[in-house]
A protein has these predicted regions:
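Short alpha-helical segments that sit at the start of domains
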Residues: 94-127, 147-150
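Amphipathic alpha-helical interaction surfaces in cytosolic regulatory modules
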Residues: 11-39, 44-98
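Short helix-capping/hinge SLiMs at alpha-helix to coil transitions
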Residues: 33-36, 126-130
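Short acidic, hydrophobic short linear motifs in intrinsically disordered regions
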Residues: 41, 128-141
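Short amphipathic alpha-helical interaction segments
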Residues: 52, 142-158
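N-terminal, leucine/charged-rich tether regions that mediate assembly and partner docking
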Residues: 1-13
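Short, cationic-aromatic polyanion-contact patches
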Residues: 163-189
Length: 189
């Protein structure tokens, strides 16, 4: 399965709850009713500041949205996450017991929020490989095939991975393999 990519680049200081709510609402308005799998890619590369209230409204709310039951899979991937973004983002995700897939400013994969060490280990392995089946991941973790399958299914339900037939695909790999289908605008225009 290849999701359609909806990409938005943010270019301002994100410092109030109403700003965050407006931005999230505009993003969701543009992709919520799509009748296929979609991955929202939110680029923080040009965001000099994000406070806790905006992190809560944008990051945590979008992560919760992708976790809701939907007829079509939904994913969110945060790119360009810098050190100064991490404290507010980590705080809100941990407070809500959420986890999100991201990429730092150097293009390295990054998990944010609350997760078990085995989730981070499996996630890093899939990010390194791009895509892999259960046996390949089980060998690298190492875990039994059944335990690895259960773990990867749980990670898919958290929208950390995309399932494509018998393989699991990192969000970065899916993004690189798919052209941007829907360039989003922060103002919804």
């Amino acid at each position: 399965m290849r999701p359609r990519i909806a990409h938005v680049a943010l270019y301002s200081q994100l410092i109030t709850r109403p700003t965050g709510r407006t931005l999230r609402t505009n993003i969701l308005r543009q992709i919520a009713d799509l009748d296929h799998a979609v991955m929202a890619v939110i680029n923080f590369r040009h965001v000099p500041l994000i406070d806790v209230s905006c992190a809560d409204e944008i990051v945590a709310e979008l992560v919760e949205w992708v976790s809701e039951v939907s007829p079509h899979p939904r994913f969110v991937w945060f790119r360009g996450v810098a050190e100064h973004h991490l404290e507010p983002i980590e705080r809100v995700l941990k407070n809500r017991d959420l986890v999100a897939a991201a990429e730092n400013t150097d293009g390295e994969p990054l998990l944010m929020g609350r997760y078990e060490p085995v989730v981070a280990q499996a996630w890093r392995e899939i990010c390194d490989m791009g895509r892999a089946g259960v046996p390949a991941i089980a060998e690298r973790i190492p875990m039994s095939l059944d335990d690895t399958s259960s773990l990867l299914n749980a990670m898919e339900s958290l929208s950390l991975l995309i399932r494509d037939a018998d393989e699991y695909v990192s969000l970065k790999c899916a993004f690189q393999d798919t052209e941007v289908s829907y360039p989003l605008t922060p103002d919804g225009q």
